[in-house]
């Protein structure tokens, strides 16, 4: 198969391939970028593989950076762009079900392509637009089928993360997973215990954000991969429930919303502990927890001024959008009116602070002062106290009299 025209991203990189060829080596576009051209999808990466060894690659170009030279990768800076150029390689026995014990550089494109995960990712493209297909990847693209390169058992035994990648590709490409490949994924799902949680999180997160996330999640559940990931053991029915009520074309607004949906489906009450077990950032944990909290509050009442002040408009919209997607009653107008009616959006907008009260009212730092400031903040947010110095002083004096 030959492409009549290369996309602009690849055309811009053609001088790189030509320079390598002029130096006497082979060079091809490889990986997901080639697959995405053939599927008429947006191109995110332009990866180049070559028969030149790293030192030979560096000799061809004037500006290079060693970013992974032990694995054969050199970053080339050319034409105001950066390109990762990797030497054809083979890999020895894998350790930890993730990393090869040794990488050997080779001159053969086929040897390089045979170490790839799936046939649709094992395609190469030369500078003329000719597609090199050593493992029937074009046929699988046409069939919309995900198939492991070579023996599926070996591919997942080598690198168990490929199992999660398979679910993710099914979701992002809307591809069926070929039967033998899927059986091997099921058989080796237990190896996911050996993979770093951070890497599994990245793949599951990409799955959730894919257009056909339900398909990917269905494969994930059928393979029982959930049993080997944090907080999901024996939660098949709840995970299946994650897909309930959404129409076929629903996609999540954000990763935070997607993970909030999972927590809600799992009926977890220790959201942060669950998210921490996935080694997510504190900021991510906070945002997901806000969405979950607001979603649960909405099960019994409309959101109050204090709810919107504490958790913010963005989390409230994501929560309400989740309700809408599930066919539950929503009230965006009330929510936005309530938010717009807030007199402050942050405690730093209050016209007095602890230092002022200590000086003006001769108060001492401590729990009493902190408690009073919380009362002031709450009263201002709820609209029962004006954010004015005199009003706040009078409010505090009255509170002190009542204590």
Curated annotation (Swiss-Prot):
Q: Which UniProt keywords apply?
A: ATP-binding, Magnesium, Metal-binding, Nucleotide-binding, Nucleotidyltransferase, RNA repair, RNA-binding, Transferase, tRNA processing
Q: Does the keyword Nucleotide-binding apply?
A: yes
Pfam families associated with the record: PolyA_pol, PolyA_pol_RNAbd, tRNA_NucTran2_2
CDD domains, sorted? NT_ClassII-CCAase (cd05398)
Catalytic activity as recorded in UniProt: a tRNA precursor + 2 CTP + ATP = a tRNA with a 3' CCA end + 3 diphosphate; a tRNA with a 3' CCA end + 2 CTP + ATP = a tRNA with a 3' CCACCA end + 3 diphosphate
Q: Which domain of life is it from?
A: Bacteria
The record describes the protein's role as: Catalyzes the addition and repair of the essential 3'-terminal CCA sequence in tRNAs without using a nucleic acid template. Adds these three nucleotides in the order of C, C, and A to the tRNA nucleotide-73, using CTP and ATP as substrates and producing inorganic pyrophosphate. tRNA 3'-terminal CCA addition is required both for tRNA processing and repair. Also involved in tRNA surveillance by mediating tandem CCA addition to generate a CCACCA at the 3' terminus of unstable tRNAs. While stable tRNAs receive only 3'-terminal CCA, unstable tRNAs are marked with CCACCA and rapidly degraded.
Q: Which NCBIfam families match?
A: PRK13299.1 (NF009814)
User: Which HAMAP family does its entry note?
Assistant: CCA_bact_type3
Subunit annotation: Homodimer.
Also noted in the record is:
A single active site specifically recognizes both ATP and CTP and is responsible for their addition.
Q: What is this protein called?
A: CCA-adding enzyme
Q: Which gene holds the coding sequence for this protein?
A: cca
């Amino acid at each position: 198969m030959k492409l009549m025209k290369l996309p602009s991203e690849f055309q811009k990189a053609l001088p790189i391939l030509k320079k390598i060829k002029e130096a006497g080596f082979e060079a091809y576009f490889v990986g997901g970028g080639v697959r995405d051209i053939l599927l008429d999808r947006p191109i995110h990466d332009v990866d180049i593989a070559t028969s030149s060894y790293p030192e030979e690659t560096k000799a061809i170009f004037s500006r290079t950076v060693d970013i992974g030279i032990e694995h054969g990768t050199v970053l080339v800076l050319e034409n105001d762009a950066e390109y990762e150029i990797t030497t054809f390689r083979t890999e020895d026995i894998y350790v930890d079900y993730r990393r090869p014990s040794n990488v050997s550089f080779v001159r053969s494109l086929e040897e390089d392509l045979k170490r790839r995960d799936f046939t649709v990712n094992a395609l190469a493209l030369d500078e003329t637009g000719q597609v090199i297909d050593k493992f029937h990847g074009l046929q699988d693209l046409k069939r919309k089928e995900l198939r492991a390169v070579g023996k599926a058992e070996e591919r997942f035994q080598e690198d168990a993360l490929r199992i999660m990648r398979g679910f993710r590709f099914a979701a992002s490409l809307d591809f069926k997973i070929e039967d033998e490949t899927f059986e091997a994924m099921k058989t080796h799902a237990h190896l996911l215990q050996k993979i770093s949680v951070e890497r599994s999180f990245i793949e599951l997160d990409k799955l959730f954000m894919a257009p056909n996330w339900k398909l990917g999640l269905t494969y994930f559940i059928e393979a029982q991969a959930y049993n080997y990931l944090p907080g999901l053991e024996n939660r098949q029915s709840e995970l299946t429930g994650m897909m309930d009520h959404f129409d076929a074309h629903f996609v999540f607004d954000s990763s935070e919303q997607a993970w909030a949906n999972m927590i809600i489906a799992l009926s977890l009450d220790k959201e942060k502990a669950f998210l921490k077990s996935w080694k997510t950032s504190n900021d991510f944990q906070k945002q997901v927890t806000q969405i979950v909290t607001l979603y649960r509050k909405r099960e019994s009442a409309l959101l109050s001024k204090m709810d919107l002040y504490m958790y913010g408009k963005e989390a409230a919209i994501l929560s309400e959008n989740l309700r809408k997607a599930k066919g539950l009653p929503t009230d965006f107008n009330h929510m936005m009116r309530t938010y717009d009616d807030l007199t402050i959006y942050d405690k730093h907008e209050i016209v007095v602070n602890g230092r002022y009260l200590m000086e003006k009212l001769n108060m001492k730092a401590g729990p009493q002062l902190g408690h009073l400031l919380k009362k002031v903040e709450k009263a201002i947010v709820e609209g029962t106290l004006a954010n004015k110095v005199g009003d706040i002083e009078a409010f505090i004096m009255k509170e002190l009299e009542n204590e």
